[in-house]
């Protein structure tokens, strides 16, 4: 049996359970062979190891039941980097890359990528946001806060994996409570799903992502309220905050931001949905230098 035959069999086993069955199968087989998916076509005609078909079938069956590939493999690519996952962390999603790209664009325009900016990542999870930023900003320093000790451990592991551990620190905390410093950038992907909507999420999210990282309270805004209430204290003069929000939440978040003294613009995701709230103090201009 060839590698290509194993891959096709895995895709058939996943079937209609995933709209990306062929891609899922390719990722699974590549992982089992210890190569990247892009290299798999070069190995299609190889004779598959005896164990490959059985292992691929086992993982494909799990995928067919709704388990995400990233959960099975324990890692996920985000912004060109591979991040280790744990049960305490969300699987990083393309929507959140919109936040990273928005932050990088503002930094480049305002201070330049070599500036010694400081970054606070609230609800850091796997550390995907702050680690991705630090790999692009050679003189930046970052701190990540999360309510889960397991997530903090995973974030530190990812910082080490990508060579930025000497510029990143992580701690268990409740949003901004206990944060003493002020930061040029505050970034956050907080829980913003309404509690009553959790049960209606896709099975791969509902049953495999930590509810602590999903549940935003009755109206989905609990964490956003908490962040905005203390943002002025932790954001340096001239600083900018980037907060991921849910579909349909832009008007509410914009009103809350204004009530707390911030002007708010939005960056859309690839689907055209306002996904990232970009917040600056109403009284400030855009010419302040980095705090760090």
Mark where each language-model region is.
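Non-catalytic nucleic-acid substrate-recognition regions in nucleic-acid-modifying enzymes
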Residues: 1-21
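Short helix-capping segments at alpha-helix termini
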Residues: 18-19, 137-139, 160-165, 234-235, ...
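Conserved AdoMet
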Residues: 27-105
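Residue-level signal for inorganic ion chemistry
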Residues: 28, 66, 96, 129, ...
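Conserved SAM/SAH cofactor-binding pocket of Class I
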Residues: 98-200, 248
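Mobile active-site "lid"/loop adjacent to the S-adenosyl-L-methionine
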Residues: 192-223
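Conserved Class I SAM-dependent methyltransferase catalytic core
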Residues: 218-280
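C-terminal lobe and adjacent flexible extensions of AdoMet/dcAdoMet transferase-like proteins
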Residues: 277-292
